[in-house]
A protein has these predicted regions:
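Short gly/Ser/Thr-rich phosphate-binding loop of adenylate-forming enzymes
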Residues: 124-125, 163
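Phosphate-binding loop of NTP-binding sites
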Residues: 1-118, 122, 128-142
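Heptad-repeat coiled-coil segments of the DHp/HisKA dimerization-phosphoacceptor module
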Residues: 123-124, 174
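Adenine nucleotide phosphate-binding catalytic loops in nucleotide-utilizing enzymes
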Residues: 98-102, 132, 137-193
């Protein structure tokens, strides 16, 4: 691998987010992405074998359902950039609470280097969960957290959403300005991804 690895986790939206990120990166870089949703310890290990010296970027989906699984996944992947899509109730039976789910999924930051970034959903109470359950002391480097979503308190946010026969449109905002976007898929949940 000659380039960087991005890790993607969350309760929902991992596969769609991985596909969207990879679709953008593939236009410019030789990119490897997780096949379908092979995001378990075995699936991630298989994906890591796909990386070679020609790979410029990798987008690896990392799913967990039990405590300690993310520790093993980040040991394999060592992402330099991470995305935390959402914190829901998937696997709450094994993890006990949304706080514990966030704490376990938040371990994705463990190997972020100095200058690495965690992109986290800033919608609803997810931002508060990330701020309280993903401490920066968990990471080997000094990373930053950037929030995205449909709320204006996010660094990257979408508004003016509407659906039509062509898909879901919205206006994307960041520090450099705004841009009208049309997704070929429907649903505000896809805008959040």
């Amino acid at each position: 691998l000659s380039g960087r690895i991005s890790g993607i986790t969350g309760s929902v939206g991992k596969t769609t987010t991985k596909e969207m990120i990879a679709a953008v990166l593939e236009t410019k870089y030789r990119t490897v992405k997780t096949y379908k949703n092979l995001n378990s310890q075995i699936g991630v290990a298989l994906m890591m074998f796909e990386l070679d010296e020609d790979t410029e970027l990798a987008v690896i989906e990392m799913g967990i359902s039990m405590p300690g699984e993310m520790d093993r996944l980040v040991e394999m992947v060592k992402p330099e950039c991470a995305v935390l899509t959402n914190i829901g109730v998937s696997h709450i039976g094994n993890l006990g609470s949304r706080e514990n789910i966030c704490k376990e999924k938040g371990k994705i930051v463990s190997y972020l280097p100095d200058g690495g970034t965690l992109f986290a959903s800033g919608n609803g109470d997810v931002r508060q969960l990330v701020e309280t359950q993903v401490p920066s002391t968990r990471c080997k480097g000094n990373y930053k957290v950037s929030y995205y979503g449909t709320e204006s308190g996010c660094e990257y946010f979408a508004d003016e959403m509407s659906a039509n026969e062509d898909g879901q449109s919205f206006v994307y905002h960041d520090s450099e300005g705004k841009e009208k976007v049309l997704l070929s898929v429907m649903g505000i949940h896809n805008v959040n991804n």
